[in-house]
């Protein structure tokens, strides 16, 4: 993995929004963010789709743009869309060009989501989350923390303790078996990334959980601008899980955090 210093960034740099951000008094109390349920008891369930094979990234962007517009207009339901992509890098709105170490390795897409550079590829479960926050809570920080909670509960199904960090969006796994860092702190690896965008309080983009990707592909970037911590996956942690196993766990955890879903 690349080495270097961690650049300081706002704790919610993974957000890109043109919706007003409501100040929250709960910012330092993530436990309050554990649930992000619809306000109406009879709210329709969230549509849940799983794509087969590898999904072209530009096609995924076009689909999300159209769906977000339809959700805003009230002609489509909220949606969570699970996909895998061919190998590629994406750059968020905070990406530093110096963090793209090998620009010719894979296709690079500039995207409107928050955050910096990340990798997508086979063996990684990407969940695109298109929810109307007006139906839930107009609180961006609460939404991001709820996405983290969703990942944490998914990992718990495999007895993995995922942790959030105030200064680093995403979910992390402590690696006590690895050498400590130069400052004596415990090694931590990132197992899941978050990068979202809001358009008039409808979210898109989402989360990415490493199930069994080729972790060497992260070597072409400084993932999320963080160089002293590495990346890991469920299989890298010694778990013989499949993408199907993760999808089941994601579904159950989603209902716990966000409410009912409708599968096909």
Swiss-Prot record:
Ranges for domain BPL/LPL catalytic: 74-262
EC number: 2.3.1.181
GO MF: lipoyl(octanoyl) transferase activity
Enzyme superclass (EC): transferase
GO terms (BP aspect): protein modification process
Main localization (coarse): cytoplasm
Keywords, ordered alphabetically: Acyltransferase, Cytoplasm, Transferase
Positions of the catalytic residues: 224 (acyl-thioester intermediate)
Annotated protein name in UniProt: Octanoyltransferase
Protein's organism: Brucella melitensis biotype 1 (strain ATCC 23456 / CCUG 17765 / NCTC 10094 / 16M)
């Amino acid at each position: 993995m690349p080495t270097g210093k961690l650049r300081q960034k706002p704790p919610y740099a993974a957000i890109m929004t043109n919706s007003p951000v409501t100040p929250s008094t709960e910012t330092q109390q993530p436990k309050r963010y554990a649930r992000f349920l619809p306000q109406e008891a009879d709210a329709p369930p969230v549509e849940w789709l799983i794509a087969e094979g590898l999904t072209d990234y530009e096609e995924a962007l076009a689909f999300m743009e159209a769906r977000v517009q339809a959700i805003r207009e009230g002609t489509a339901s909220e949606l969570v869309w699970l996909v895998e992509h061919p190998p590629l890098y994406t750059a968020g709105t905070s990406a530093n060009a110096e963090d793209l170490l090998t620009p010719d390795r894979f296709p690079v897409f500039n995207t409107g989501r928050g955050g910096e550079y990340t990798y997508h590829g086979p063996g990684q479960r990407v969940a695109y989350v298109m929810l109307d926050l007006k139906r839930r809570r107009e609180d961006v920080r609460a939404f991001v923390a709820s996405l983290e909670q969703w990942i944490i509960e998914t990992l718990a199904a495999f007895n993995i303790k995922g942790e959030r960090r105030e200064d680093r969006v995403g979910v992390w796994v402590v690696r006590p078996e690895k050498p400590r860092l130069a400052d004596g702190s415990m090694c931590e690896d990132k197992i899941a990334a978050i990068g979202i965008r809001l358009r008039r309080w409808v979210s898109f983009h989402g989360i990415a959980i490493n199930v069994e990707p080729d972790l060497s592909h992260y070597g072409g970037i400084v993932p999320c601008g963080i160089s002293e911590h590495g990346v890991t996956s469920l299989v890298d942690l010694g778990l013989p899980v499949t993408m199907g196993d993760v999808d089941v766990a994601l579904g159950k955890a989603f209902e716990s955090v966000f409410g009912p879903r409708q599968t096909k």
